Amino acid sequence: MVKMGIGYDIHPLKKGSHLVVGGTKISGEFSSDGHSDGDALIHAIIDAILGAANLGDIGQFFPSDEKKWKGMDSTHFLSTTIKKVLSVGYKLEHVDTVVILQKPEIRQFVSKIQHKLAHVLQTNKENISIKATTADHLGFIGTSEGWGALAIASLSKLE
């Protein structure tokens, strides 16, 4: 049986030197403002995976009010999540994502992001889809006040 989960995350942007997207540092004028490293893409993927396995959400496992997660690399959260899901008998089949960010342009980093996520998720790069779009200068994303990501994950139950 294949199970599906959906995830969504947004973070404010602040002046900075780089943005972390899918565990990949992208140089630019903005950084994500979050309790951890503010990687909205990974946070959305985590919620999608946990949802598909009916295990809750990112806040239950990594609460943003716990000091130990302050500044944490979100790949740690993702690695812990996939290990948990594997331990209860699921296999990751596919992750499909959309990153919504006005700037910087991330299309040239998609392959690198896929490779990083595939490594952390213990799967093939072909099982990770990353799409990038802008908000066409509309709303808080369009004015570069924030960014967001959507993710859908499919898991199969191992027999």
Regions found by a protein language model. Name each.
Residues 117:
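Glycine-rich, mobile lid/loop segments that gate access to catalytic sites or pores
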Residues 141-159:
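C-terminal edge-of-domain segments
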Residues 65, 130-134:
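Pyridoxal 5′-phosphate
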Residues 134-141:
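Short, surface-exposed loop/turn segments at secondary-structure boundaries that line and modulate
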Residues 124-127:
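Short acidic capping loops at alpha-helix termini that bridge into adjacent secondary structure
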Residues 97-101, 130, 151-153:
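A structural signal for short, well-ordered beta-strand segments
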Residues 2-111, 121:
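RNase III-family endoribonuclease catalytic core
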Residues 114:
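Generic structural marker for isolated residues within well-ordered, non-membrane alpha-helices
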